[in-house]
Amino acid sequence: MWVARDAKVYPTAYLGAPCIIGHKTEVRPGAFIRGNALVGDNCVVGNSTELKNVILFDNVQVPHYNYVGDSILGYKSHMGAGSITSNVKSDKLPVVIHNEGEEIETGRKKVGAMLGDYVEVGCNSVLNPGTVIGRDASVYPTSCVRGVVPERCKGNIAVKK
């Protein structure tokens, strides 16, 4: 485990190994980092947020009540309160990424979401297993997203910015 000297980790946060916490990152009270986590510089891992098998690029914010598992969050991406990355299908079969009629077999039972840089996920949204969201896209609050969301889209694949 490695935590940058200028990172702030509150006493009630849990850090499991292996884990790297970058410079000026804040791990707030009640955060639960289960391990296999690479958290970049200037990130916020907030109250009651759980991370597992993740890469958070610099300036990512998962500030309140988020679950991020088996996922990659790009530079300056933000997940609103209560939004989660679901990483296991309800039928427990391997995750397939759906992209405009193409099905990409992952061969893995646990795959969360992959967010490009500058992605905004609205409050209480669910990103289903294998969701890919392109750079500078926005997901509306309370959305349930599946498949590939192109870059610079708003909503649930619907409206271009």
Regions found by a protein language model. Name each.
Residues 1-32:
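Extended, small-residue-rich solenoid/repeat segments and analogous flexible loops
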Residues 22-23, 40-41, 52, 69:
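The repeat-register position in solenoid repeat domains
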Residues 16, 44, 109:
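Short, flexible, glycine/charge-rich loop motifs used to bind or transfer phosphoryl groups or to couple energy/partner
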Residues 47-48, 53-161:
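Glycine-rich hexapeptide-repeat left-handed beta-helix
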